[in-house]
Amino acid sequence: MRHYEIVFMVHPDQSEQVPGMIERYTGAITEANGKIHRLEDWGRRQLAYPIQDLHKAHYVLMNVEAPAETIEELETAFRFNDAVLRNMVMRTKGAITEASPMAKAKDERDSRRGPAGDRSYDEANAEEIAE
């Protein structure tokens, strides 16, 4: 079996369908005795240029090990799914399991925010002190 990196972009209005799509695609890979080495849901991101008058899309990255026939089935599923705006399947030399630069940047941003989530750590402390 070969290793592949798969990225697909979903229409932003169909973002709620993404978990089901991921489950369906990963299910097809595991049924064919393939392995999922990395799965990252990057969420909605700004596009570099408009696609079908859209400026954002929901991105998903997968690194898998699967038979070529399964990858062909996935590409066909992408082609006939109107919610998938673009997809890219690349063969890689080996399994990539480390976090992508996009995921690392997101983790870094989240760690800088502190335990309060979206608000800064100082704002959360100021509210607690005021109470």
UniProtKB/Swiss-Prot annotation:
GO-annotated biological processes: translation
Recorded GO CC terms: cytosolic small ribosomal subunit
Disulfide cross-links: none
Any one GO MF annotation of this record: structural constituent of ribosome
Regions that span the bilayer: none
Pfam families, A to Z: Ribosomal_S6 (PF01250)
Region entry Disordered, spans: 96-131
Family: Belongs to the bacterial ribosomal protein bS6 family.
UniProt name for this protein: Small ribosomal subunit protein bS6
Organism: Shewanella oneidensis (strain ATCC 700550 / JCM 31522 / CIP 106686 / LMG 19005 / NCIMB 14063 / MR-1)
Gene (UniProt): rpsF
